Curated annotation (Swiss-Prot):
Gene Ontology CC terms, in alphabetical order: cytoplasm
Organism, scientific name: Janthinobacterium sp. (strain Marseille) (Minibacterium massiliensis)
Keywords: ATP-binding, Cell cycle, Cell division, Cell shape, Cell wall biogenesis/degradation, Cytoplasm, Ligase, Nucleotide-binding, Peptidoglycan synthesis
Subcellular location: Cytoplasm
Enzyme class, spelled out: ligase
SUPFAM superfamilies documented for this protein: MurCD N-terminal domain, MurD-like peptide ligases, catalytic domain, MurD-like peptide ligases, peptide-binding domain
Family assignment from sequence similarity: Belongs to the MurCDEF family.
Name of the protein in its database record: UDP-N-acetylmuramate--L-alanine ligase
Length: 465
């Protein structure tokens, strides 16, 4: 019966998770249309590939649709969703459509609170170098491919598994990765951390009896749930009990150099073209999967050495010219952009920057993402943001939420001043952030723009300044 479905419409097609699935379906021969509130690189790419993309949501957009795909960001009162219900057009959640794609291949699903996008990209890159030509769907732009999705000819599909709405429980992969488990998106789990842990355990139960769970043993919560997992397990990380273990990791010129030990294999010397100890862990997950699937170590080493990263994951813009202004001399500053929006991610990025740019002053421009996250992790944000040398703090990016008292940017800035380790410069409007940064920085600084909201447009303006 599925041959009757030819036209698939995406509500919110420009989203990172939606656009990748849309691209794979285009390459499978489906007619794809979609709508979004604005244009971005993803929508422009899909148009070039043959999709019909409309700006704005309207009932007439779905006139020819045999099915529509929605993400959790799409509300029930969306006019296209209402029209689909009235016409009895199937409404398919994004994760269910991803699960359908996974049924066409052997799935490799990457889960965890942090590191999903980079780990998925590393796995896809390693398998591609090993000749397996995987299909992949990633939540960010894989720089080497120039896309966040690709239809491969091989038997595997590599995809992120999203725990934010528990939709990863729709997937049925043969290999799973759990990078870590932290308190985030707790509204999905009734603000009960035990329910979040149980969801990850249930995720591993989606594996077939011959499947394998690849787990980061460095993470305390992952270690805690391991006895409750009834599938084959391969562990990785720095921990002395890790089956795929990284040792002697050090940062040299923005690369991570380390050795990987695993029983039955010769020690592997790795030079990873990404900074940060967290990326060493992510690379170990890719190494574990590569060996599970028979990829030669030399191919894995080559892929990791040549890995160009993912869009907005410690994206390095290089040294940017800093013009002379008044009594401030001309010079240069290094610019890095990152999607991180959780205290753990922020800490990892700061640590990576310290390793990649030793001895240089670190200026962090941070935009909190969601009032609920700011409220739930307020003290953690104060602790982590206090570790930078200078902080430019934006107002919270709401992401559709209503403001919460004492969970806004000004309150966070005040708490940071009271803590006494950093004196943040608060910026109410993100449009004012580039000028604020340029006024603060000096020759030799390292600037990190960070957050999952509208701060993504700031780096381009800094480059043009």
């Amino acid at each position: 019966m599925k041959h009757k479905v030819k036209n698939i419409h995406f509500v919110g097609i420009g989203g990172s998770g939606m656009s990748g699935i849309a691209e794979v379906l285009l390459n499978l021969g489906y007619t794809v249309s979609g709508s979004d509130l604005g244009s971005n690189a993803a929508t422009r790419r899909l148009i070039e590939l043959g999709a019909k993309v409309t700006l704005g949501h309207a009932a007439e957009n779905i006139e020819k649709a045999d099915a529509i795909v929605t993400s959790t960001a799409v509300k029930e009162d969306n006019p296209e969703v209402i029209a689909a219900r009235e016409k009895h057009i199937p409404i398919v959640p994004r994760a269910v459509m991803l699960a359908e794609l996974m049924r066409l291949r052997r799935g490799i699903a990457i889960a965890g609170t942090h590191g999903k996008t980079t780990t998925t990209s590393l796995v896809a890159s390693v398998l591609a170098e090993g000749g397996l030509d995987p299909t992949f769907v990633i939540g960010g732009l894989l720089n080497s491919a120039g896309a966040n999705a690709k239809l491969g000819t091989g038997e595997f599909i590599v995809a992120e598994a999203d725990e934010s709405d528990a939709s990863f429980l729709n997937l049925s992969p043969v290999i799973e990765v759990i990078t870590n488990i932290d308190a985030d998106h707790m509204e999905t789990y009734g603000h009960d951390f035990e329910k979040l842990k149980q969801a990850f355990i249930e995720f591993t139960q989606r594996l077939p009896f011959y499947g394998v769970a690849v787990l980061c043993i460095d993470d305390a919560t992952v270690r805690e749930i391991m006895p409750r997992i009834s599938k084959l397990i391969t562990t990785y990380g720095f921990h002395e009990d890790a089956q795929v273990r990284a040792i002697d990791a050090k940062a040299i010129d923005g690369h991570m150099h380390f050795t990987v030990l695993q029983e039955g294999y010769a020690p592997m010397q790795v030079s990873l073209n990404q900074p940060g100890m967290h990326n060493v862990q992510n690379a170990c997950a890719a190494i574990a999967i590569a060996r599970e699937l028979g990829v030669a170590d030399h191919a894995t080493q080559k892929a990791l050495t040549e890995f160009n990263g993912v869009g907005r994951r410690f994206t390095r813009y290089g040294e940017i010219s800093l013009p002379a202004v008044n009594d401030k001399p001309a010079g240069t500053f290094a610019l890095v952009d990152d999607y991180g929006h959780h205290p753990v991610e922020t800490a990892a990025t700061i640590a990576a920057a310290r390793g990649a740019y030793p001895g240089r002053r670190l200026v962090l421009a941070f935009q909190p993402h969601r009032y609920t996250r700011t409220r739930d992790l307020f003290e953690d944000f104060v602790k982590v943001l206090s570790t930078t040398d200078m902080l430019v703090l934006a107002e919270v990016y709401a992401a559709g939420e209503q403001p919460i008292v004492a969970a806004d940017g000004r309150t966070l800035a005040h708490a940071l001043r009271v803590a006494g380790k950093v004196d943040p410069v608060f910026v109410e409007k993100i449009a004012d952030m580039p000028a604020t940064i340029m006024n603060i920085i000096k020759d030799g600084d390292v600037v990190i723009t960070m957050g999952a909201g509208s701060i993504s447009g700031v780096p381009a303006k800094l480059v043009q300044a």
